[in-house]
Amino acid sequence: MSKKVKQKPEVHEYQAEMQKLLEILVHSLYTEREIFLRELVSNASDAISKVQLTTLTEKNILDKDVELEITISFDEDKKMIIVEDSGCGMTKEDLLENLGKIANSGTLKFLQQAQAENKTAENLIGQFGVGFYSAFMVADRVELVSRSWQENSKAWQWSSDGGGQYEIIPVDYK
């Protein structure tokens, strides 16, 4: 039988080999490489749904008159697939919170907040926070440029090669 010690225990965070964890996560959830496109389009659709819902209650929205759309294009020279949307966008803090933490869903948080405020938001798709990472099945590097719907927001670029680190840098936005 062990004696009780009157000392506070040390608290430690789990450590993970992110590249290996991402690989296991992505390849166990997705069996077909093409699924990444569906996941990115789903994220874009959620971003548009969020901005539609937000415009019902918020007045200070950047680019109120912008057409809500999702565009998929290809840059063969750079070997890039580009998925663009005119949805809610993300702040630097959103990028850190939602892309810097695997399985952390900004959509789930938005849905919970909307339900708490009695808003209808059932058409949001992504709620598990892992679909975005399926892009690493087909890409050596993933880049995301985003600017929040909020007035005076800066644009930020998030990029990673799927290893243990990612980068965030402010960028000019067209």
State where each predicted segment sits.
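GHKL (Bergerat-fold) ATPase N-terminal catalytic module, capturing the glycine-rich phosphate-binding loop
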Residues: 1-174
